[in-house]
Amino acid sequence: MQTQLGENDISLPQYYNNRELSWLDFNYRVLQEAYDKNNPLLEKLNFISIFSSNLDEFFMVRVAGLKDQVKMGYDKPENKAQMTPQEQVDAIQEKAKKYVDTQYERYNELMIELKDYEIVMCEPHELSEPLLSKLERDFKLTILPTLTPLGIDAYHPFPKLNNKSLNIFVDIDTEDAINSAIVQIPSLIPRFLTYNEGAKQYVVMVEDVITYFINYLFTGYEVLNTFTFRITRNADLTIHEDGAEDLLIEIERFLKERKSGSAVRLEVDGRTENPDDLDWLIETLEVDKQDVYFLNGPLDLTFIFGLVDHLSHKLNYLTYEKYSPQIPRSLGNNNLYELALKRDIFFHHPYESFEPIVDFIREAADDPNTIAIKQTLYRVSKDSPIIKSLKEAAEKGKQVTVLVELKARFDEENNVHWARMLEDAGCHVIYGMTHLKTHSKIALVVKRIGGELTSFVHLGTGNYNDKTAKLYTDMGIITTNEQIAEDAINFFNYLSGYSVKPEYNKLIVAPFDIRDVFIDRIDKEISSHLQHGNGKIMMKMNSLTDKAIIEKLFEASQAGVKIQLIIRGICCLKPGIPGISENIEVVSIVGRLLEHSRIYYFHNNGDERIYLSSADVMTRNMIKRVEILFPVEDKEIGKRLVDFMDLQLSDNQKGRYQDEHGHYHYVENNLSPLNSQVYLMQEAIKYGQELKKRSAQPSGMPVVSKRRANWMNRIRRSLKK
């Protein structure tokens, strides 16, 4: 359907989802995975844990920021759904509590299912006498010495309780008066203890153990009442970059300050029976009653990560079947550097191994012909092999320049450590850009080959993190394209010095140009569609919040352009609204792997324009971050990207479509089941097996591939079965 442009006001709030509420809906889609009958039991539990971990960060950052606005009296509505900060806080609390109640309901159901496998979550009093004796002995030896009861009276003010710490509130009868104390549970002691008896394994939470033996801490007094609570604090504090002589020192100050930010959420054991104690705690922490969450189970369900890890040794059949990333199809058994001199090499992680990217830096560090290595780092693993190679390269006299983004949220401490280590090794380390986060993923290796300098460039959508590369779906390209190489050199010169914004040949860089290029490409697609009637836009990203681009997508929809958006997380655009967005569809895929790649496709009357990027279509990515959008010009790689998006749009197992009201629904059709992530794993394994067969063939013998059939044709045939 085509609508007259400008017929409707595309800025009206009813056409938009609020950013924060849309994020909560995404996190609920994560929780839905704990209900999926196709997921193994321990993986269902993991999704319960991921939901909690996500929600913690959401409160520490997003809710904290809104509450700061409310305290300052700021009541200006946000620019899409037109909700004031207070309206957002109220709506968040209502929706979050509903989802948390669902989470705990599901948690308790899964704990019952665990009993079928002889795993029993229990409290100390439910243990047999022999096990209770063991528990008491373990408490005295390994837990009691670590505990410090903190009295609360005129001589003992309310203690500073760390963010996300677990605490026990205690009322004690001291004969003269009823006093209170707090016992903070150290984060370094195990969250649960396990005991075997017969075929069963019993799991006891450490807070229940401490509560059961609480009298050991208050000898001579009667303990009247206890309850467990947990505080979430504001972690969205300001890093004062202006005037900071050393950003490393400023970041370290910020990290200390973040541990004791104002409280934004109070979680309490739902069995709490003393309302006076709770009221006193609410008043002391200066939280509102709507900030209090009564939970029907253990506080902080992120402990499940450790529990699943513990149980998976015995119950590995209740986890996903192990998957090993395969050799990249674009690389095969070729030497990476030799092949890159001939053509671009494409990588799709974690279906395809991240190891070649690690080798890209490792081999550059080892090669005496390498002159320079330059790289941006946003999040890396704790024992990063890439960091190791960069250090070794510098120690061997190579010119190594590394931008380590110190402001990468919740990775600041890790990145400060790496920055210091790289500097000590002789690397030139850049801490980032003032008032901007450098989120781009780029590495440049300069080698002397045949007497000339040749530049190899890796551009990607995800972090240089060998651990998360096994869980996050990301894409990247290694190229020796001379124009991109020149752009990469100019990009690093811009980061490392005081040069003005460079003019790039092919790279498109935020905060300067990405938004403008997107708007220009959408405008061109509108014009092309009005002339040829075949306009089409496909975009895959993590989140869509930028209003200028949303409005432009609305215009394209009104012009009749077909728009397909694959958005895992936040989506402020409502699709399917007559006269506004009826030509837009939005699908979210949440599954075993975290969808993280960003792809942008414009049909352009058959002269397709395809890009990969580190950037989502969020306002922060457009104006507050250094991002790279780069073109995919290799036709074979471009076809793989289009086929991939078609595949994801056909996913009827993990795909959820958003309706015109902003609600998400599982895809329901009569086609054969298709889980796009599982399909890609299977395809990667098939290619790996075929590659091994080829390698085993005697030299000189012809190899006939059985994979000539078009990829998407095979998918379509399978869906018709």
UniProtKB/Swiss-Prot annotation:
InterPro entries, per database record: PP_kinase, PP_kinase_C_1, PP_kinase_middle, PP_kinase_middle_dom_sf, PPK_C_dom2, PPK_N_dom, PPK_N_dom_sf
Keywords, in A-Z order: ATP-binding, Kinase, Magnesium, Metal-binding, Nucleotide-binding, Phosphoprotein, Transferase
Which top-rank group of organisms is this from? Bacteria
Q: Where are the transmembrane segments?
A: none
Q: Which GO terms describe its cellular component?
A: polyphosphate kinase complex
The top EC class, named as a word, is transferase
Residue span(s) of domain PLD phosphodiesterase: 434-468
**UniProt GO BP:** polyphosphate biosynthetic process
Q: Does the keyword Transcription regulation apply?
A: no
Q: Which residues carry out catalysis?
A: 439 (phosphohistidine intermediate)
Q: Which Pfam families match?
A: PP_kinase, PP_kinase_C, PP_kinase_C_1, PP_kinase_N
Maturation and modification: An intermediate of this reaction is the autophosphorylated ppk in which a phosphate is covalently linked to a histidine residue through a N-P bond.
Q: Which cofactor does it need?
A: Mg(2+)
Q: Which reactions is this enzyme annotated as catalysing?
A: [phosphate](n) + ATP = [phosphate](n+1) + ADP
* Molecular function terms from GO: ATP binding; metal ion binding; polyphosphate kinase activity
Report the SUPFAM superfamilies cross-referenced here: Phospholipase D/nuclease, PHP14-like, PPK N-terminal domain-like
To which protein family does this belong? Belongs to the polyphosphate kinase 1 (PPK1) family.
What this protein is reported to do is described as:
Catalyzes the reversible transfer of the terminal phosphate of ATP to form a long-chain polyphosphate (polyP).
Q: NCBIfam families annotated for this entry?
A: poly_P_kin, PRK05443.1-1, PRK05443.1-2, PRK05443.2-1, PRK05443.2-2
Per its UniProt record, what PANTHER family does this chain match?
A: POLYPHOSPHATE KINASE
> What name is this protein filed under?
Polyphosphate kinase
> What is this protein's gene name?
ppk
